[in-house]
Curated annotation (Swiss-Prot):
UniProt organism field: Salmonella paratyphi A (strain AKU_12601)
Subunit structure: Homodimer.
Family designation: Belongs to the YbaB/EbfC family.
Annotated InterPro entries: YbaB-like_sf (IPR036894), YbaB/EbfC (IPR004401)
Name of the protein in question: Nucleoid-associated protein YbaB
Matching SUPFAM superfamilies: YbaB-like
Lineage, opening ranks: Bacteria, Pseudomonadati, Pseudomonadota, Gammaproteobacteria, Enterobacterales
Function summary: Binds to DNA and alters its conformation. May be involved in regulation of gene expression, nucleoid organization and DNA protection.
Gene designation: ybaB
Length: 109
């Protein structure tokens, strides 16, 4: 299945990938992404650990319906969370792209 030296090479690749993944996870934790709702009237910025860093609300919304504002804040947070997830997937996919895996072998992410 692995051929001559194949398992050793696979282990070496796995160790290299593990180092790259650790570095990538550290980079992702430092990322900040902003989600928006209400055509940019509400903005929520979160980091790679999904911790909310900032909430910006256009002053014009403070005079409006409280429930609508709450919905816009939730939608902006969900947009930011979706964006950070997409960024994480893209960065992690780039780490594993160079590793030659046996047919049918899937990575856990």
């Amino acid at each position: 299945m692995f051929g001559k030296g194949g398992l050793g090479n696979l282990m070496k690749q796995a160790q290299q990938m593990q180092k790259k993944m650790q570095k990538m996870q550290e980079e992702i934790a430092q990322l900040e992404v902003t989600g928006e709702s209400g055509a940019g009237l509400v903005k929520v910025t979160i980091n790679g650990a999904h911790n909310c860093r900032r909430v910006e609300i256009d002053p014009s919304l403070l005079e409006d319906d409280k429930e609508m504002l709450e919905d816009l804040v939730a939608a902006a947070f969900n947009d930011a969370a979706r964006r950070i997830e997409e960024t994480q997937k893209e960065k992690m996919a780039s780490v594993s792209s160079g590793m030659q895996l046996p047919p049918g072998f899937k990575m856990p992410f």
